[in-house]
UniProtKB/Swiss-Prot annotation:
It comes from Kluyveromyces lactis (strain ATCC 8585 / CBS 2359 / DSM 70799 / NBRC 1267 / NRRL Y-1140 / WM37) (Yeast). It is found in: Nucleus. GO terms for biological process: mRNA splicing, via spliceosome. Residues 1-28, 54-156 are annotated as: Disordered. The keyword Nucleus applies. One of its GO terms (cellular component) is spliceosomal complex. This is Pre-mRNA-splicing factor SPP2. Associated with the spliceosome. The gene is SPP2. Pfam families: G-patch_2. Keywords: mRNA processing, mRNA splicing, Nucleus, Spliceosome. Residues 10-26 have a biased composition (Basic residues). The keyword Nucleus applies. Involved in spliceosome maturation and the first step of pre-mRNA splicing.
Amino acid sequence: MNGISISLKSKNKVKKKSGTKKKKKPTVFGIADNDEKATEFKITSVEERKETIKKPLCITPTEPLRSSLNARPESGSLKSEDEQAVVFPEESESKFDFKGPSALRNNIPEKTNEEEYEEVPVEGFGTALLRGMGWDPSAENDSSSEKSTLLHEKPHPELVGIGAKLTTASNSLRTAFMPLIRRKKTANE
């Protein structure tokens, strides 16, 4: 039998002394208080605490925002005049080619009249919609003579899953079926 044996008994027997002595407790520096050798401590370096300046975590835009250009200062605000002043960029300095709402009004298409809706036949709209989704009207007319049966309409063999093909092994299983029978085992077998 293999195994490991560990003895929990200590080999050294501790003899108790009749006199009591106080144990030396180490100080912060790891030296006992009663130790006469270490009487002076020299500190060679002192770490200076550096205060970190907290910067705001925001991204300032390079150009003033359009909303701040149009904003009017409130009369009861306590900001100085320097903080309220907004510098408007010159037209040559502006990176944006913004001409205002009049440029947007020129690009709006004309409103469609009811007469134009009546000109488009409903059948034409339906075929256009189907062509946009990939329908080919010429392919439908050619294949109308040959009507193909869909996969779910075709008969398939019993006990065979979807997409599985019937093999000769599965045919032989149907003809020669032997059910499982439980047999009692005895000690002699």
